[in-house]
């Protein structure tokens, strides 16, 4: 009887640990006819979603830290990190995101046309004294050795602007774009 109880305890511990993290691989068609790979890791213990977009110099890593309420993106070509306070009205809850990813991966029929634009001014929004406790350790690990900029949500890209945008997050799901430069 004791070996059976010990086996069930070990099985339940490993079962709980395996449910703590879930990984999704999504392939999105690119404009040049190829595919862009997105890897999404949902960590239920840390209450985070980490999105890696594998697209050459446009590759990025984005962390949605639901515990601390921040989103941070590191864009390979920019060699910088961008952080924004999470708007829970615009960003789905972690369990809804997880369900959406599951449905997208298994049925490959769900898509969202909505995009969230994040705007920053590189001359005014550099964060020089970073309070890592506020942002949490997942964002600290992502952005510790990079310049960190504060972003703001924009309803749509401005008509007249200089600079460029890079897509981060989930291209087909959350559609977050980082835009730098001067907007008139």
Curated annotation (Swiss-Prot):
Keyword Chloroplast: no
Subcellular localization(s) per the UniProt record: Secreted; Golgi apparatus
Xref: PROSITE patterns: BRICHOS
Keywords: Disulfide bond, Golgi apparatus, Secreted, Signal
Coiled coil (residue ranges): none
Superkingdom: Eukaryota
Signal peptide start-end: 1-20
Disulfide bonds: 81-143
The BRICHOS domain, residue ranges: 54-151
Chief localization: secreted
GO biological process, one term: neutrophil activation involved in immune response
Tissue expr: Stomach foveolar epithelium and duodenal Brunner's glands.
Keyword Signal recorded: yes
Pfam families the record matches: BRICHOS
GO (cellular component) term, any one: extracellular region
Subunit structure: Heterodimer with TFF1; disulfide linked. Interacts with TFF2.
Protein name as it appears in the record: Gastrokine-2
Higher taxonomy: Eukaryota, Metazoa, Chordata, Craniata, Vertebrata
Gene: Gkn2
């Amino acid at each position: 009887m004791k070996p059976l109880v010990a086996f069930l305890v070990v099985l339940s511990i490993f079962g709980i640990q395996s449910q703590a993290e879930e990984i999704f691989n999504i392939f999105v068609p690119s404009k040049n006819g190829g595919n862009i790979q997105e890897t999404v890791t949902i960590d239920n213990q840390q209450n985070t979603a980490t999105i890696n977009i594998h697209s050459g110099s446009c590759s990025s890593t984005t962390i949605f830290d639901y515990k601390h309420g921040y989103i941070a993106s590191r864009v390979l070509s920019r060699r910088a990190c961008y952080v924004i306070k999470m708007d829970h009205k615009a960003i789905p809850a972690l369990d809804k995101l997880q369900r959406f990813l599951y449905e997208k991966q298994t049925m490959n029929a769900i898509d969202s046309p909505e995009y969230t634009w994040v705007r920053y001014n590189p001359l005014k929004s550099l964060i020089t004294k970073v309070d890592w406790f506020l942002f949490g350790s997942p964002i600290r690990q992502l952005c510790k050795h990079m310049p960190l900029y504060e972003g703001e949500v924009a309803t749509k890209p401005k008509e007249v602007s200089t600079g460029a945008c890079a897509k981060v997050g989930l291209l087909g799901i959350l559609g977050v774009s980082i835009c730098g430069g001067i907007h008139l």
